[in-house]
Amino acid sequence: MAWWKAWVEQEGVSVKGSPHFNPDPDAETLYKAMKGIGTNEQAIIDVLTKRSNAQRQQIAKSFKAQFGKDLIETLKSELSGKFERLIIALMYPPYRYEAKELYDAMKGIGTKEGVIIEILASRTKNQLQEIMKAYEEDYGSNLEEDIKADTSGYLERILVCLLQGSRDDLSGYVDPGLALQDAQDLYAAGEKICGTDEMKFITILCTRSATHLMRVFEEYEKIANKSIEDSIKSETHGSLEEAMLTVVKCTRNLHGYFAERLYFAMKGAGTLDGTLIRNIVSRSEIDLNLIKNQFKKMYGKTLSSMIMEDTSGDYKNALLNLVGSDL
């Protein structure tokens, strides 16, 4: 499946919102849930996880109009920990949320390259343009310039190349001659020589459409007698290897890529809550149902069953509401 198709597959939406929506009573319910001593977390879960993002924005406006308070700030003052992080993530408009995730990945000491790679490799050109716009509006800074300042070398090159969103081609047309040439160029840039021409890999992986790349990967395997993934693993390392492999995974099976991200966020000791929250929130109104199907196929268990094993309390209940039934 081409990596961009998930953006137009409505059957994938797990959070559809309320069909008979009125923001005013919802805002009142939230106000009462946080008024006085103690907080009614279940009431907050029932409202915010069962509304679409657009509906949540209307609730926030109604909350401000009725009670003179900012809903996000009020939620922050009443909630804490992972549950707070999840609920606040739900309140951001999608592009602003992803801009915030990118900003947080780069601010302070150290850079969370994995977050940047995940977002840039899996979004469409239009989505990336909206994220860049939101980033500039919210942080008064240019996303591309910040990435350049925060990364270096070939990782910087591939991230900037991905940010330009040159891979979109909805026509599905593939030039067999060019696909073969690209496969030969990749082989010549890696397996055939001592050392690696990283820029050749970056140029082809970041500027060709998904349908074209699928053909390139087929041709490459015939020439090299190994998969493109195996060659990337032997020719590169670290964050550059992760970025290239992510592009390949998103090209081959976008839903499989997100299923893998969710699985490894929960597998083993500890939980990568940032990865879990980001991927469930950001895909809930796009293709989370399709990701759930892929998750079950790949790992032999449901996403919700793994969430139940790995999380607890209000945090668990809110996540399960967003994921929906996947028995």
From Swiss-Prot:
GO molecular function: calcium ion binding; calcium-dependent phospholipid binding; phosphatidylserine binding
Organism of derivation: Bos taurus (Bovine)
Keyword Metal-binding: yes
UniProt protein name: Annexin A8
Repeat region (Annexin), residues: 21-92, 93-164, 177-249, 253-324
Binding site for Ca(2+): M266, G268, G270, D310
GO CC annotations on file: cytoplasm; sarcolemma; vesicle membrane
Keyword set, alphabetical order: Annexin, Blood coagulation, Calcium, Calcium/phospholipid-binding, Hemostasis, Metal-binding, Repeat
Family: Belongs to the annexin family.
Domain notes: A pair of annexin repeats may form one binding site for calcium and phospholipid.
Main function: This protein is an anticoagulant protein that acts as an indirect inhibitor of the thromboplastin-specific complex, which is involved in the blood coagulation cascade.
One record GO biological process: endosomal transport
Coiled-coil segments on the chain, per record: none
